[in-house]
Structures are given as structure tokens and as C-alpha cells.
Amino acid sequence: ALYENENWVPMGFTYDCYVTADQLERVSEEERAQILCRAILLDDDQISAFGSLLEPLPDEELTNRGEDAYAADCAARRAAGVAAFTATDTGFTAKTAYDADELVFFSVPYDDGFSATVNGEPAAIEKVDDGLMAVYVPAGENEIEFTYHTPGLKVSACVSAAAIVVYGVYLLWIIRKRKSQPGSKR
């Protein structure tokens, strides 16, 4: 028989609640993942910016763990999933259709090489949940595009090309120097 994970979550979804680092530290490391399925971890600046979109996670929810609670949290994340998620050669795209403004979470590691647009306009990428990504979207239908460019790749390619040119000039100089010396083979 083939195993089927009934508690799957989509790559992109929204939350109803946020949790603080202080709250999360009160939960054992082994059980933090379950809390992060229930609420998004935001820092103080993010709470100031996006707290109006989410409710703070009540402290009693930190102890409400178990298989049934986990299954309910996963079902809630599936229900709040993006309408479509597609991997591309340079990143990924997602389509959303939420009734209200939302902070959309993606279970993709944050990296400075990512840039994002929402409906073609540049969007700030939030580093949430200790290293994953989220982006703000307004109510209604939206197209989100994340594009990845390796940081420093263009600079390193230019440096490498310059080094090849310098090496080529050096080789030409050596060849000409040897040819100009008396008694050298031609």
C-alpha cells in the first residue's frame, strides 16, 4: 500500500493568527512545528506592520497540541491555500483570491537572491518563521511572482571574464618577450 499524508499543507497559504518568539520559546523544540502550522512567527516590526491582518495567538493555544489539533491546523491551512502554485525555472508563481488583505506565507526558504512582485509591482519579501517567506497581498485576485537570481553571480562572472582577459594579455606578453630575445626559437 502507498502511504498518503492526509495532513498535507500547500506551498502557499495564509494564517489567522501570529505567534511571537517569546511565546514560541515556551514550547519544546520538538513541538514548535505544530504551533507554526497554527500561527505565523512574526517579529515586532512585522507585528506592527501586519498585526491588523492577524489575531495574536492566545497563550492557551500553545498547549492545545495533539493529533486532532494538528489535523485541524493542517485542514485550516489547506482551506487558506493559494488558488494556484507553479514552480518556474527562476522561482515560482502563485495566484490568490482572498476576500481581505492577507500576508501570504510560502514554505520556501528565505534568500536575499529572491525578489517578488504582486500584480507586476515590486513587493517586499518578509522573512518569517525563522527563515521562510511571506508577502503582503491586497484583497481580490492577485498574481505573485518570486524570481531567484544568485547573489553576486553577475559580479563574479565579470571578475572571471576580466581575469581571463588579463591572463590572455599576460600570455601574449610572455610569447612576444620570448620571440624578441636573441637566440629564441621562432
Regions found by a protein language model. Give the residues of each.
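Extracytoplasmic
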Residues: 1-75, 99
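Active-site-proximal, structured, solvent-exposed surfaces of multi-pass membrane proteins
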Residues: 44-186
